Amino acid sequence: GLTVQNSPAWNLHPYFSNHTRWIDLKVLNPKQSPNTDGMDPESVDGLEVVGVYFSLGDDCIAMKSGKFYMGHKYKVSSRNVDIRQCYMRHGHGAVTLGSEIAAGVRHLSCKKCIFEDTDRGLRVKTRRGRGEDSVVEDILFEDIKMDGVLTPFVVNSYYWCCDPDGHSTYAVSYTHLTLPT
């Protein structure tokens, strides 16, 4: 398959795309490289990520749906996402929702993956001002092997410091979040 390597920032950024498949790829960056997310799907519908090997310095997959303006204007969540049989190594989060999720993330499944030596397994990042229309729902993690993962699951409700207006108080709501044992 295709290899994407040594990107100075986000490696792959599917944006407002529908019914896309990413199969048998390698996404490689040095583990000390900042802001080198492997894949940042934003406001996507019908995304499949299958058999992808990630080894990098930031989040392996970071789901997004708009930071401020685009998320509030179009209100298109990322939805119907299927991640399976992927290997995620080194990075801050193996699969991260946010922090740019102004329109939410819905119907995501991550199955039969390996997370190795990441700081976090599943990470949800929210931030004031990025959530008036945001709902995170129907998230399923199943048959995940974590080895050397410092924190398997974490929700950061106040990711970063403050937003430009300094006083936004919106919150993201979570429903049907499942982590089977």
Across the structure, where does each feature detected by a protein language model lie?
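Short glycine/acidic-rich loop motifs that flank beta-strands on beta-rich extracellular proteins
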Residues: 8-14, 30-38, 46, 50, ...
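C-terminal structural cap/anchor segments
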Residues: 134-174
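Short "repeat-start/strand-capping" segments in structured domains, especially the N-termini
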Residues: 17-21, 44-48, 79-80, 101-109, ...
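Long, well-ordered mid-to-C-terminal structural blocks that present hydrophobic/aromatic surfaces
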Residues: 102-140
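Internal alpha/beta core interface subdomains
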Residues: 1-16, 21
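Conserved small/polar residues in nucleotide/adenosyl-binding loops
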Residues: 175-181
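Extracellular polysaccharide-degrading/modifying enzymes targeting complex plant/algal/animal polysaccharides
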Residues: 1-5, 69-71, 161, 165-169
